[in-house]
């Protein structure tokens, strides 16, 4: 269960994986994009997981329709704004939204730097209108290769003060982290935090690589850490967090079933592991589902679920002062200061 006196966070949430089906339909019409269906219910199976996908790449294809309708920078601004509204409606007190500007730009050949600026504009307007706190993590989509990732990084660096961290996502098996060491050196030089998708499609060596070569402070998914006790000890001792996404890992067939998910073991190993959504619109779930349905099925006790909720703020990419201010704000709103 969710502890209402603690801030509720989602620190692994893809902006470009959370484009509303209704918005896809409307933007598709606006920008003359031929979609696989003309009404909402017929479109839904194409843009939302209805059964578990055979692998990560198949799952990621569900995201493609969402970005296919981003026909202008205004469209990017709109979906960013709607992401903030969705986060607030989900009950989140704090979220880190991650996005790949190259992925969002490529279908309509939008300027990548312009996409970054449009997303920032949409998030800023949303935070103002809905009185919430959202931070942005830039993604390099490794699937498109090192050169495209450098374009993406350059665009993100042009707004370096509005981005809190850099991530690497996409085809983990085909494009290992070692190819991107220079990119992450630039990110660290810019003062950014580092989180990396690793140990989702590949083994624990991918997580080691993210930590030792790329400087990862947090690992996205990280499920294969469970087969390397030395790695788990290293992560626990060094406070390297795991951004767990329970339902997502089942839908991508990364983990066979929730009762076999390693999150509970990570928590018992004292790794600062957290509960997150991943791509809510594509998955057809929200953060409450992860806490109230997925976590118990994954074997977490109420105490362990609360610990994961605490971890979400503890390893967030904001200052200790900002974390304390958020705790106090939640207590004022839902309890007693």
Curated annotation (Swiss-Prot):
A GO molecular-function annotation: 2'-deoxyadenosine deaminase activity
Positions contributing to Zn(2+) binding: 12, 14, 197, 278
Cellular component annotations (GO), alphabetically ordered: cytosol
Positions of substrate binding: 14, 16, 170, 279
Keyword Nucleotide-binding: no
Enzyme Commission numbers on file: 3.5.4.4
Residues flagged as site, Important for catalytic activity: 221
Intrachain S-S bonds: none
Catalytic reaction(s) noted: adenosine + H2O + H(+) = inosine + NH4(+); 2'-deoxyadenosine + H2O + H(+) = 2'-deoxyinosine + NH4(+)
Name of the top EC class for this enzyme: hydrolase
Cofactor list: Zn(2+)
Note on how the cofactor is bound: Binds 1 zinc ion per subunit.
InterPro entries linked to this entry: A_deaminase (IPR028893), A_deaminase_dom (IPR001365), Ado/ade_deaminase (IPR006330), Metal_Hydrolase (IPR032466)
Residues annotated as the enzyme's active site: 200
GO biological process, one term: purine ribonucleoside monophosphate biosynthetic process
Record keywords, A-Z: Hydrolase, Metal-binding, Nucleotide metabolism, Zinc
Transmembrane segments: none
NCBIfam families linked: aden_deam, PRK09358.1-1
Homology family: Belongs to the metallo-dependent hydrolases superfamily. Adenosine and AMP deaminases family. Adenosine deaminase subfamily.
Physiological role: Catalyzes the hydrolytic deamination of adenosine and 2-deoxyadenosine.
PANTHER family associated with the record: ADENOSINE DEAMINASE
Protein name in the entry: Adenosine deaminase
Annotated organism of origin: Pectobacterium carotovorum subsp. carotovorum (strain PC1)
């Amino acid at each position: 269960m969710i502890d209402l006196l603690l801030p509720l966070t989602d620190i692994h949430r893809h902006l470009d994986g959370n484009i509303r089906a209704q918005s896809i339909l409307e933007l598709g019409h606006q920008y003359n994009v031929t979609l696989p269906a003309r009404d909402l219910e017929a479109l839904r199976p194409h843009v939302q997981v209805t059964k578990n996908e055979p692998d990560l790449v198949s799952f990621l294809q569900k995201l493609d329709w969402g970005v296919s309708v981003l026909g202008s920078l205004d469209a990017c601004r709109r979906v960013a704004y709607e992401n903030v509204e969705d986060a607030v409606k989900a009950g989140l007190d704090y979220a880190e939204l991650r996005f790949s500007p190259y992925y969002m730009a490529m279908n309509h050949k939008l300027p990548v730097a312009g996409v970054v600026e449009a997303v920032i504009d949409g998030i800023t307007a949303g935070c103002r209108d809905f009185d919430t706190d959202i931070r942005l993590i830039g993604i390099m989509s490794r699937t498109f290769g090192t050169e495209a990732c450098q374009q993406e990084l350059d665009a993100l660096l042009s707004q370096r003060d509005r981005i809190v961290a850099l991530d690497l996502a996409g085809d983990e098996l085909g494009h290992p982290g070692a190819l991107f060491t220079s990119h992450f050196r630039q990110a660290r030089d810019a003062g950014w935090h580092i989180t990396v998708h690793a140990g989702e499609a590949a083994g624990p060596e991918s997580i080691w690589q993210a930590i030792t070569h790329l400087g990862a402070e947090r690992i996205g998914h990280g499920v294969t850490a469970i087969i390397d006790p030395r790695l788990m000890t290293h992560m626990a001792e060094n406070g390297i967090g795991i951004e767990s996404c329970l339902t997502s890992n089942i839908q991508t067939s990364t983990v066979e079933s929730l009762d076999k998910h390693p999150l509970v073991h990570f928590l018992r190993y004292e790794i600062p592991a957290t509960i997150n959504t991943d791509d809510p619109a594509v998955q057809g779930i929200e953060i409450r589902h992860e806490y109230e349905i997925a976590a118990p099925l994954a074997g977490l006790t109420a105490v362990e679920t609360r610990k994961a909720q605490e971890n979400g703020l503890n390893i967030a990419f904001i200052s200790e002062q900002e974390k304390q201010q958020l705790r106090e704000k939640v207590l004022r709103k839902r309890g007693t200061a």
